[in-house]
Curated annotation (Swiss-Prot):
Main location: cytoplasm
A Pfam entry, by short name: CTP_transf_3
Entry protein name: 3-deoxy-manno-octulosonate cytidylyltransferase
Family: Belongs to the KdsB family.
PANTHER family, per database record: 3-DEOXY-MANNO-OCTULOSONATE CYTIDYLYLTRANSFERASE, 3-DEOXY-MANNO-OCTULOSONATE CYTIDYLYLTRANSFERASE, MITOCHONDRIAL
Length: 243
């Protein structure tokens, strides 16, 4: 099951999930991409998102407005849907309308092999890594996440040195091996690191839970601001989205 948490009042870009992407609302684009891989449900926090999904025949459920994270919203949706504890859950984003089907499939595969949860990352350049909106991740020898940060990591101490490992940009999608693990994660107390960085995935690492990271090729960009949307619409074309 794929669940897409969709919040109307995003702090940096209100109503962004309803913005038009070549004739379709953003959240509908995201759901249509997800439906190419598995059954998808949008977890809405507002009737307007719910009605939009219904208009385009996208399955949706109405959840509380008071969740602290998309993961919490996913869990409520999973409970509403009556998912069994052993059912696998993917958490995609409602602001990634350009996410490729191949990336979702890669996440699904990684989740099947991950003992706890999985996510994806892509190689980025130094200029991209400077943006705090693009989260960076560093990995251990088994391709599990060591840390996620809005800062550039790892930092080159010697300015004239060459990087021995690529910079990795996190793609904010998650796979939980089963619903029981989603329940376990949400039951953990928030930690100071996730509150400092505003990154919910740091809670898992704080409590020594493994996050497997699949490195993928992707041109997708998350839409955090109006400027992000304007830039993305210049880069992508309607034909590219009709896969």
């Amino acid at each position: 099951m794929i669940i897409i948490p969709a919040r109307l009042k995003s702090s940096r870009f209100e109503n962004k999930v309803l913005e038009d992407i070549f004739g379709l609302p953003m959240v509908v684009r995201c759901a249509k991409n997800a439906n190419l891989v598995d059954e998808c449900v949008v977890a809405c926090d507002d009737e307007s998102i719910m009605q939009t999904c219904q208009k385009f025949r996208i399955k949706a459920v109405l959840t509380s407005k008071h969740h602290n994270s998309g993961t919490e919203r996913c869990l409520e949706a999973a409970r509403i849907l009556g998912l069994k504890n052993d059912e696998r859950v993917l958490n995609l984003q409602g602001d990634e309308p350009f996410l490729e089907k191949e990336v979702i499939l890669a996440l699904l595969e990684a989740t099947q092999n991950a003992p706890f949860m999985a996510t994806c990352a892509k190689v980025i350049d130094e200029e991209q890594a400077k943006s705090p909106n693009l989260v960076k991740v560093v990995l251990d020898s088994q391709n599990n996440a060591l840390y996620f940060s809005r800062s550039l990591i790892p930092v080159l101490r010697d300015f004239d040195a060459k990087r021995q490992t690529p910079l990795l940009g996190h793609i904010g999608i998650y796979g939980f091996h089963n619903k029981e693990i989603l329940e376990e994660l949400c039951a953990l107390k928030p930690c100071v690191l996730e509150e400092i960085e505003k990154l919910e995935q740091l809670r898992a690492l704080y409590y020594q839970k493994k996050i497997a990271v699949k490195i993928v090729q992707s041109q997708s960009v998350g839409i955090d601001t109006k400027e992000d949307l304007q830039n993305a619409l210049k880069i992508f074309s309607p034909n590219l989205l009709e896969r």
